[in-house]
Amino acid sequence: MKIIILKFGGTSVGSLNRIKKVCKIIISYIKKNYKVVVVSSAMSGVTNDLIKKSNQISNNFPNSEKDVLLSVGEQISCALIAGKLNEMGYTSRSWMAWQIPILTDGAHSASRIIKIKRTKIINYIKGGGIPVITGFQGININNRITTLERGGTDASAIMCAKFFNANKCIIYTDVDGVFTTDPNLLNSAKKIKEISYDEMLEMASLG
């Protein structure tokens, strides 16, 4: 069984038309006989809007509740992707981090993934389903939703690749590959040809 993780960033799912294109990309890998696991960010702008709302309603909004609030962004994009895939004739459903579960430790708004339980997702893809997983979040020992550190959705995808023994992990973003720094900010950024899961996790945690 060939497993591929496809991670889509906020720009990639930033509009309904872009989500339709994302679904075509997913199907292209299904046709190549891959079992596809999708990890999605929130639509671009949604997370910032939710943060703005939390700041407007309270000057001291608890991080635990902010995590619950911010987790909604990824749920929206995942539901839209899964809904479109079903319309196109494919079995798909959105998976919240707590349903899998994706286990985290650390402080609210800055947690790290420590384990992803395999059973439900592996059984689902074996049955022909396309899971669409919320990135950037997990649940802690108290069964509370937590959000990850900067670069959290990339980290979610990389950890999925590790725990699901994926053959490939492809991250769709607004730059062409992995760079030493943001090429949109510095012309001196260099493209990295090859990188390990551990190195990717370290880079993702640093944003």
Task: Name every feature range the model reports, one short phrase each.
Residues 1-207:
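Nucleotide/pyrophosphate-binding catalytic subdomain
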